[in-house]
Amino acid sequence: MQKKVKVKPNSKQQKIAEQDDGSLTVHLKSPPVDGKANEELIKLLAEKFAVPKSHITIKSGLSSRQKLIEIDTDI
């Protein structure tokens, strides 16, 4: 399954909000430095979708706030 994700780093609290179009807005505490925000994003999405972190891949937008995430739910 693929999801469009808008990331908001340096937030005060972690939060995942689903938008009307099915995309996600994810608020992260980590700064967008050295991949820390991407690591936190993968960890949060793994918890939300109950899959291992290895089943989540950032397909595009590695250094952007707009990302396309691939979630392998076939366990």
Swiss-Prot record:
- Enumerate the Gene3D superfamilies for this protein: YggU-like
What InterPro entries does the annotation carry? DUF167 (IPR003746), YggU-like_sf (IPR036591)
Cited SMART domains:
DUF167
* GO cellular component term, pick one: cytoplasm
The record's region (Disordered) falls at 1-32
What NCBIfam families has UniProt attached to this entry? DUF167 family protein
State the similarity comment: Belongs to the UPF0235 family.
Q: What is this protein called?
A: UPF0235 protein Ava_3894
Q: Which organism is it from?
A: Trichormus variabilis (strain ATCC 29413 / PCC 7937) (Anabaena variabilis)
